[in-house]
Amino acid sequence: MPSFDVVNKIELQELDNAVNNVKKEIETRYDFRNTTTEIDLHKGDLRITVVAADEMKMRALEEMLHAHCVRRKIDPRCLEFKEIEATSRGAVKREVQVKEGIAKDVAQKIVKAIKDSKLKVQGAIQDQQVRVTGKKIDDLQDVIALLREGDFGIPLQFVNMKN
């Protein structure tokens, strides 16, 4: 039976490139000269630490990060910005969690949307992904179109199409 997987994967190298491009832009921009501004990617737990002199510069850094992620074909919806915290040096700090994989509640919404479509396919939750199987590839392509139209709060990729 034909099947495919619905996943939410981040290309880690592209994310690293986006963060490095933001670092380069910080070095060249006039408004960031002589300020405490840092951005670091922690690959182990998929988070980005952003430190800026004040909240205005923090917003500018967020916009730069969004722009560079889009240029690198990373959907900005996978970035979850935490609360802004004050540091001991008078600067502000913010953690950005990178969401990868499909959470259980989002996977249930995806399976429910597939069932509500009345197509002859089945959706099954497998760890951090959803496997969709059906008798016809045309039905699977209709499911892909349906899921692209829906808003589940995370970027979805469709991989491993088997015939």
UniProtKB/Swiss-Prot annotation:
Q: Which PANTHER family match?
A: UPF0234 PROTEIN YAJQ
Q: Which domain of life is it from?
A: Bacteria
Report one GO cellular component: cytosol
CDD domains documented for this protein: YajQ_like
Annotated family: Belongs to the YajQ family.
| Matching NCBIfam families | PRK05412.1 (NF003819)
Q: What is this protein called?
A: Nucleotide-binding protein DVU_1981
- Which keywords does this Swiss-Prot/TrEMBL entry list? Nucleotide-binding
Query: What Pfam families does the record tag this protein with?
Result: DUF520
Q: Which GO terms describe its molecular function?
A: nucleotide binding
Cite the InterPro entries for this sequence: DUF520, UPF0234-like_C, UPF0234_N, YajQ-like_sf
For this protein, the record's HAMAP family field holds: YajQ (MF_00632)
Q: What does this protein do?
A: Nucleotide-binding protein.
Output the lineage of the source organism.
Answer: Bacteria, Pseudomonadati, Thermodesulfobacteriota, Desulfovibrionia, Desulfovibrionales
State the species of origin.
Answer: Nitratidesulfovibrio vulgaris (strain ATCC 29579 / DSM 644 / CCUG 34227 / NCIMB 8303 / VKM B-1760 / Hildenborough)
